[in-house]
């Protein structure tokens, strides 16, 4: 009976780890066709709005030098000019298809992550008793560690999150989240988040040491400062 009670929280922890992956896999397969049909139908009605048209034109300009194209058009005979215009038309259609695929990818990933968040929130609320047992296990495990190991672990985590080399890790993680949600890569937003998050975490961590650790385990704070120095 005791083994069964111990197995249930472990099963709950395992399900929390793998459930987001399963939800993402199922939602991607089930929603992709529906979102594609919805987007293509909507595009037939509106074709390109101003933002989409600007995006397509910017991509086209990146590949072709318009000034050189004008000179080439003047030198081409009529038959070659028609073929050239036909090639430009096909290339523009290809740009539009790529643009639509990108928009579908964005909507699909955002919808999948939103559904995963709702399902996980409901699942956590439904099994909050098992979550409480897991929390007690973690607290008991941390309580049995020595103050030296605790201080070393805190120092390791803080150096990884807010240390000198942490911005590169934050850049990779935030970039992965952006990609997972299907958002475009914006260097200014990414730089702002990378420069802001470590500062916020550092402030929260110092406040936590001041308010919690000093009251619970003063010796741990002393060891931490000794190792940090």
Curated annotation (Swiss-Prot):
TM spans (from-to): 6-26, 107-127, 189-209
Reaction it catalyzes: K(+)(in) + H(+)(out) = K(+)(out) + H(+)(in)
GO biological process, one term: potassium ion transport
Protein's UniProt keywords contain Membrane: yes
Gene Ontology terms for molecular function: antiporter activity; proton transmembrane transporter activity
Superkingdom in the source lineage: Eukaryota
Membrane topology: Multi-pass membrane protein
Name of a matching Pfam family: CemA
Sorted UniProt keywords: Antiport, Chloroplast, Hydrogen ion transport, Ion transport, Membrane, Plastid, Plastid inner membrane, Potassium, Potassium transport, Transmembrane, Transmembrane helix, Transport
Subcellular location: Plastid, Chloroplast inner membrane
Keyword Chloroplast: yes
Gene Ontology CC entries for this record: chloroplast inner membrane
Known function: Contributes to K(+)/H(+) antiport activity by supporting proton efflux to control proton extrusion and homeostasis in chloroplasts in a light-dependent manner to modulate photosynthesis. Prevents excessive induction of non-photochemical quenching (NPQ) under continuous-light conditions. Indirectly promotes efficient inorganic carbon uptake into chloroplasts.
Entry's family note: Belongs to the CemA family.
PANTHER family, per the entry: CHLOROPLAST ENVELOPE MEMBRANE PROTEIN, CHLOROPLAST ENVELOPE MEMBRANE PROTEIN-RELATED
Protein name: Potassium/proton antiporter CemA
Taxonomic source organism: Crucihimalaya wallichii
Name of the gene encoding the protein in the UniProt record: cemA
């Amino acid at each position: 009976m005791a083994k069964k009670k111990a197995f249930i929280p472990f099963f709950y922890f395992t399900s929390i780890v793998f459930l987001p992956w399963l939800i993402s896999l199922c939602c991607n397969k089930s929603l992709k066709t529906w979102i594609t049909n919805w987007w293509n139908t909507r595009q037939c009605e509106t074709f390109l709005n101003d933002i989409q048209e600007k995006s397509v034109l910017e991509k086209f300009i990146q590949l072709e030098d318009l000034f050189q194209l004008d000179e080439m058009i003047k030198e081409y005979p009529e038959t070659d000019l028609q073929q050239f215009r036909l090639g430009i038309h096909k290339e523009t259609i290809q740009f539009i298809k790529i643009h639509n695929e990108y928009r579908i990818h964005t909507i699909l990933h955002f919808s999948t992550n939103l559904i995963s968040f709702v399902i996980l929130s409901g699942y956590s609320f439904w099994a909050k008793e098992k979550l409480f047992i897991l929390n007690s296990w973690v607290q008991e495990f941390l309580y049995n560690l020595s103050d030296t190991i605790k201080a070393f672990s805190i120092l390791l985590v803080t150096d990884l999150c807010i240390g000198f080399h942490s911005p590169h890790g934050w850049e990779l993680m935030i970039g992965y989240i952006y990609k997972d949600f299907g958002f475009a890569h914006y260097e200014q937003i990414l730089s702002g988040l990378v420069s802001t998050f470590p500062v916020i975490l550092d402030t929260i961590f110092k406040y936590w040491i001041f308010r919690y650790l000093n009251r619970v385990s003063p010796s741990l704070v002393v060891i931490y400062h000794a190792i940090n120095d």
